[in-house]
């Protein structure tokens, strides 16, 4: 299994002397030092006894499963919310009071228990949803485990053990890796079995291509991309076989560190800006409710506690428990009125509707609160590969030889995908390809192991993306006889297949790092055997002695032509193009009769890769191509849109600096001629910057290349500390910690790993950066609509509080009972509030800077407006209650048809003294099909008899809130300029809410539950007459608001943050 094992063949280092690779950098030591440190021989591997000892020290090679939160703790966490705690307290108190409901309480039987039961139901549903979301949070860690290898081929006790469970590996184990294997642990490459080894580790490091590995040690301070002699757990071998030494297992591997970082990031997840505002609102509401409830109760102390003064001292105290309980119930009703119970449900509904809108734009929301957070995004940290670019290598330039020596021809190649029909070659000689171009096409098609297939309407590569791009180029070049329709549904690579039929491949000289080229021998249809070579331009050119001209003739490669080719190569490299050169020659004389048979004498030369350089000599150079991972077509405009919207774009990539800079210039992150020396840093360079926050505050775009997971996390952490709202994109395992830490984690739906998706808040179905920008615009629109219905619901609650407070202050019977207020808050207000989520977005929504994350939901002016509206609601609901008791008519509307008795306002305000009134009598009155008579106890007229007045109050409240929802269409815009039909859903919602109110009014059973009765036509006219003025009042307030907006708001300048500091 390789050489060099004799030095340490019988050595076994004491297990306790082993150290983690953090202190022993295996990548910085040669192979013999590593074997000695881990006490192992490549030929024998570890002994069984030594494996057992190391198992005790290092444990199993698997990722830790964090202790899950107990279901009891999860339930308790759901009540760690101010609004929820207020609701819980109100429910408990209401439940207790239901048992002690006195004669003056008025609520009997089932009605008394409806309120607490409904509140408990709300809390239970809220808790279930919360627990479900919490249990989904650990899926990122579970997905991470799926990446781990399940089995490994290991040398133990001198015997090769196939299919050993990978979890049983320990540091020091000798493992054999073959093509297609998933790497089971972090390992040092100690010997190559094949001539070359390539590993796909982009999901861990962010590199766009498979990386060649070597046995040679590297600098001890190398970053993860620079550790060319290491292979990492979870990555995949795509080419070659090798022998490795396990250096780290389990949580000590790179993927284990990612696991730890995800756990750490999950512990630091913050509430969304809206949740913070609602929590603050809840805390303020708690204090206000407490004060008002206490005030209401104290105002009415005189009704249940009295005393006489004797000799200047209070004596003969009289206390009525029933009345005390009754007024305490009024205080509880006030609490119920003040709490917007329906708000959580409406917010969830609006966010859910927002997810549907975003899904139509290919943005799949995984976590509902992220919909709102998107709207205040100030910085987008984007990965390059696959997000800004297509992650599909494409040829962008083709350089061929000219008609005479010392001349070159250059062709620009369009297209950004593996679709052969995507773009064309500019100025291409269709149907009349010269001999030089034919040779380039032949080499690109045959010296190639990749394939392109059509899957689900998309073209995907099988094999190396670079080679797939070459085959796509061949299809765009067409065929000499004029066959240019390269692709069809059943035959994607027609031209490549035709070349393969004409030139039968008989041998392959595999790529290796030393000669940096690949060659194939072909048996041509012309009867000649040729060697076709592709590889690094400098290396292929160095082994070339001739060049092929346009007409197919060859000339000796002189220094001028060599310099011309190298200069063109240099110019293309400045554009971050990866260049591949093409050459050919007649096969060496030893292979003149070779047909691929293993019995041929020349076949032995092919078994030794050291012979390949001599075989690939005396070549004829024919041309070269420049390839790249091209930027997506929509990205440049999307980045310009971000700039207009006040959102900064930072590119954070694991790719090399020059490639990333070229892409950033092309897509508009940087200007073409801009000095970016202070804006483009590697991850390591950024970590060495003294004032990192100041660096991140630079206006315009920033680039961080060769970035490791820790660099991404640090950038996100610093931005969040500086008050930015950060959206982070990523697709790899290495991105997961930063995705979890960011305010908005955005994963790629097509190329993204399951780990990245599970750690994210948003998944892009099309992997397209421009989709993020569209989602941000949608998020802003949703937030504006949420702000509209939150303000609407809060203003409604202010009105209810004002109504109850006025009732208590005036001393009249309570106009509305808690169950009625609960119905209004949960059901009646729900449809209009939800419909406000359908308000059309502002046309200039992406031309405004992002709102501040601490932007107030309710400004002082808005609060004043709703206090005015709330006061009117209180006056209207209490006023209609008083009108029914004290007037036969109002505004010409006859109210005497039901035959109820009139009382004076003084009697109504002192109804508690009714029993002391001499000769007080009331007439029976009708409500619907019921007749109410109070002959036995006339004082019941102010309790059971208030049912009609209470119905009027409730109906006025419902009607005002419906009309007030029209006011909420726009913060300052008049209904004249923004009429109700701009949102037809709102008109439908108003009809639904009125319909629901009619149901509880006119269905006898429900009317009994809610303590109301049907209203006559005249009574409905009274309701409308009292309710409609709310529109006029708010129109006046909006007009004042428009006139004074310049005084109340000032624009936020770009330097605002610096001034604040």
UniProtKB/Swiss-Prot annotation:
Show the catalytic activity.
Ca(2+)(in) + ATP + H2O = Ca(2+)(out) + ADP + phosphate + H(+)
Q: Which residues lie on this side of the membrane: Lumenal?
A: 92-115, 299-327, 807-816, 881-950, 1003-1017
Record: residues binding Ca(2+) 1: 797, 800, 828-829, 961
Q: Give the first-level EC class, as a single word.
A: translocase
- One Pfam family named in its UniProt record: Cation_ATPase_C
Q: What is its main location?
A: membrane
Q: Which spans are transmembrane here?
A: 71-91, 116-135, 279-298, 328-345, 787-806, 817-837, 858-880, 951-970, 984-1002, 1018-1038
Keyword annotations for this protein, in alphabetical order, are: ATP-binding, Calcium, Calcium transport, Ion transport, Magnesium, Membrane, Metal-binding, Nucleotide-binding, Translocase, Transmembrane, Transmembrane helix, Transport
Question: Induction of this protein: by what?
Answer: Induced by cadmium.
InterPro entries xref list? ATPase_P-typ_cation-transptr_C, ATPase_P-typ_cation-transptr_N, ATPase_P-typ_cyto_dom_N, ATPase_P-typ_P_site, ATPase_P-typ_TM_dom_sf, ATPase_P-typ_transduc_dom_A_sf, HAD-like_sf, HAD_sf
- Please report the record's description of how this protein sits within the membrane: Multi-pass membrane protein
Q: Does the keyword Transmembrane helix apply?
A: yes
What NCBIfam families does its record include? ATPase_P-type
Name the family.
Belongs to the cation transport ATPase (P-type) (TC 3.A.3) family. Type IIA subfamily.
* Functional summary from the UniProt entry: This magnesium-dependent enzyme catalyzes the hydrolysis of ATP coupled with the translocation of calcium from the cytosol to an endomembrane compartment.
Q: What is this protein called?
A: Calcium-transporting ATPase 4, endoplasmic reticulum-type
State the organism of origin.
Answer: Arabidopsis thaliana (Mouse-ear cress)
